[in-house]
Amino acid sequence: MAETRLKEILAFVNHKGGVGKTTTVQSLATGLRRFGKGYFGRGADGKERKPRILLVDLDPQVSLSFLFGWDQVNSNNKPTTYDALINQTPLPVYKMQEGIYLAPASQKMVSIEPFLNQMAVPRKALRKLLLKPLQEMQGTELADEGVNSILDAFDYVLIDCPPAMSLLTYNALAAASSVVIPVQLEVLATKGIAEITNAVIETREDLNEDLDIRGLLEVMSNDQTKATRQFKEYLSKKFDDYVFDSYTRRDTKMVEAQAMGTDIFTYAPYCRVGQDYERFTKEILESMPQ
C-alpha cells in the first residue's frame, strides 16, 4: 500500500442499526475534504491537494448512497455495487461531489448471499473488486489523470456495512485495512462489540492478516446521564487501547442537515456535533498511516 496513493480502507461496522454508522461515514468523508489539505502532499500544479475519497455502500438500506444524492428510483438501470459483486465486474464509481465518489448500494443486496456463496471464496468478492480497474461512470477526471485503479485513484476508501455480521460485512473486513466501530452508549449497542472484535480476529487469521481495529467511536453521547457515564467507564476499562479520544454528542442539527440533503460541515459546522466530527476527522488524519 505504501507504493500507491491509497492510505486506508476503513470499514464501519456495527451489527445494530441506528447507532450513527452511516452518519459517521458521511461526516468523515466530507470532513476529510474540509480538513485534509496539508496531509496528502502536492498535486501536479505544486499546490497542496485535498484527499479524494471513495465511498462503498454495502448496506441494502442504501442510506449512505441516498445521503450523497443517489436516486434509487431513477437509477434502476445504472450499475451498482451489487452488480459488480455478483458479476465480478469493475466497481462502478460515480462522482457525487468534488473529490467524493460513490459505489452505490442496491436494495437487491438483501438477497445477495446465495450469489456470493457460489464463489470460491465468498468473503473475498469485494477485495477482488478493489484490485480490479474501476469503472468511471460520470466524466473522465480519473481517466484524464491516467489512473484506472482504486489504489491509485483514491486516498481513502470508506465502506458502510449493513447493520449485521453478514457475509457482506465479512467482505468488508476482508477488504479493509482497519475497522471503525461506532458505539452508542447503551446496553444493546455495546454488548455486540466483542462479537465484532472476534470477527476481526477471525478475518485476520483466515483472509486479511493486515486487518486492524482503528478504534471505537462513541456516538450520540450524553454525558449528563449516569448510564452514559457508566458505559464510558466500561469502554475505557475493557477496550482502552481502541477508544478514540474524540466522540460525538446528540444534536438536532445533524437531523436537520440530512433532511436538507447536505452534511453537517456545510449546514452548521460550528454546532456541537459539527465540532465533534471535526475533532474525529482530525484524529483520523493525525494518526493516518504514512
Regions found by a protein language model. Name each.
Residues 1-290:
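P-loop NTP-binding core
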